[in-house]
């Protein structure tokens, strides 16, 4: 039993790491290449940032915080993953499909231009 | 008791409402689920004057709660008022919707299961079987004696494409007494008047209005499937979502045959409370 203890601990640690990876950002690996490469038709436009801010306040702020800083278990949208690792196409894909097992609903009910405006706002947060 | 009721009302009034982005449909369900933790309170009404019967107002109040991203549960209380007759509570319904596919596809199915216990219902939230004008000729005292304990199932199919929402419902309903399965359908399309949001905050921007068309009707029952002696309705529909406030919907609908009520006027108000249970936990 004692001989197997290190292997058991390694297995537990590996499981914990895998669970953490799944719970945090595993969605990025699921984004199809065609969506990953999509370009934002509103990229960097100040008007789109303002419109995206309005959409964020109406639909997202209650869960993700007024300034996207995260609320309790709902993640911050100012993290490196959102601001650096994820492309605008990745964020658009996440908004369309959600991450339903993790509690993030699909926002496909918003028209596509509004989703891109929201992405523009989210990407403006790192500046 | 009175103090606690007032406290609950105050908490609800202070709760942060959300722009619900509801579809302007009265009968048709879209595949879009309630966001988890949100409570949507909706009041829907239908006014009509069947030939040879009194004018009526059928109403229901609905409490729709997002249990999970893939599971929405809803409780209804129904009532109706008929001119020269009476105003009565007609029963309750409890429905659950489940979304089996957890990503957005071209066509998105949702499974709907409802139990209803109603009598003399005139809210017309669905039309199935041979529902039609003859049901409205019966006075309330007599209609109330016909208790309808029913299981209703729907296959909801929904698509979003270039701002358009297209939704189709296939309905099968079974009275738990010895009645046969009854069938019906509903479909609707709608689109916001403008797809992109405005940079400034505004109450009456075009993107806050949605317009569309809705059609629904009965398809007979297991022993007499088809269009014979079934009612059908079609009409334009529109809604407006106030910023951080209610959504108001309206639709004039027209009966397509003699078995249908010639005109129905539907109107509704819905109000969404975000993260409803969080209010009682003293946080977000």
What are the roles of these predicted feature ranges?
Chain B
Residues 20-284:
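Transmembrane beta-barrel domains of Gram-negative outer membranes and organellar outer membranes
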Residues 15-17:
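N-terminal signal peptide c-region/cleavage motif recognized by signal peptidases
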């Amino acid at each position: 039993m004692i001989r197997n203890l290190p292997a058991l601990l390694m297995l537990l640690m590996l499981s914990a790491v895998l669970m953490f990876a799944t719970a945090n950002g595993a969605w990025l690996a699921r984004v199809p290449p065609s969506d990953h490469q999509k370009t934002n038709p509103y990229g960097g436009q100040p008007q789109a940032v303002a419109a995206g801010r309005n959409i964020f306040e109406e639909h997202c702020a209650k869960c993700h915080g007024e300034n996207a800083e995260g609320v309790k278990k709902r993640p911050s949208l100012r993290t490196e993953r959102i601001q650096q690792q994820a492309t605008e196409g990745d964020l658009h894909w996440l908004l369309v499909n959600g991450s339903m097992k993790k509690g993030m609903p699909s926002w496909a009910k918003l028209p596509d231009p509004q989703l891109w405006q929201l992405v523009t706002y989210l990407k403006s947060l790192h500046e | 008791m009175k103090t606690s009721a007032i406290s609950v009302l105050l908490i609800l009034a202070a709760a942060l409402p959300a722009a619900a982005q509801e579809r302007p449909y009265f009968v048709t369900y879209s595949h879009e689920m309630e966001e988890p933790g949100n409570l949507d309170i909706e009041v829907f009404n239908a006014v009509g004057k069947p030939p040879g019967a009194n004018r009526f107002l059928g109403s229901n109040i609905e409490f729709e709660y997002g249990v999970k991203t893939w599971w929405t549960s809803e409780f209804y209380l129904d009532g109706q008022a008929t001119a020269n007759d009476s105003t009565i509570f007609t029963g309750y319904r409890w429905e659950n919707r489940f979304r089996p596919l957890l990503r957005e596809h071209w066509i998105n199915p949702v499974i709907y299961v409802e139990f209803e216990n109603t009598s003399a219902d005139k809210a017309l939230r669905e039309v199935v079987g041979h529902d039609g004008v003859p049901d409205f000729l019966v006075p309330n005292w007599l209609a109330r004696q016909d208790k309808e304990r029913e299981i209703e199932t729907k296959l909801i199919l929904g698509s979003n494409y270039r701002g358009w929402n297209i939704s189709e419902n296939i309905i099968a309903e079974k009275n738990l007494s010895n009645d046969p399965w009854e069938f019906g359908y509903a479909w609707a399309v709608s689109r916001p008047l403008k797809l992109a949001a405005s940079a400034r905050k505004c109450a009456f921007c075009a993107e806050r209005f949605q317009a569309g068309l809705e059609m629904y009707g009965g398809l007979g029952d297991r022993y007499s499937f088809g269009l014979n002696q079934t009612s059908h309705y079609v009409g334009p529909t529109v809604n407006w979502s106030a910023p951080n406030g209610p959504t108001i919907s309206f639709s004039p609908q027209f009966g397509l045959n003699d078995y249908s009520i010639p005109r129905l006027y539907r109107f509704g108000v819905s109000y969404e409370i975000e993260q409803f249970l969080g209010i009682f936990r003293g946080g977000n």
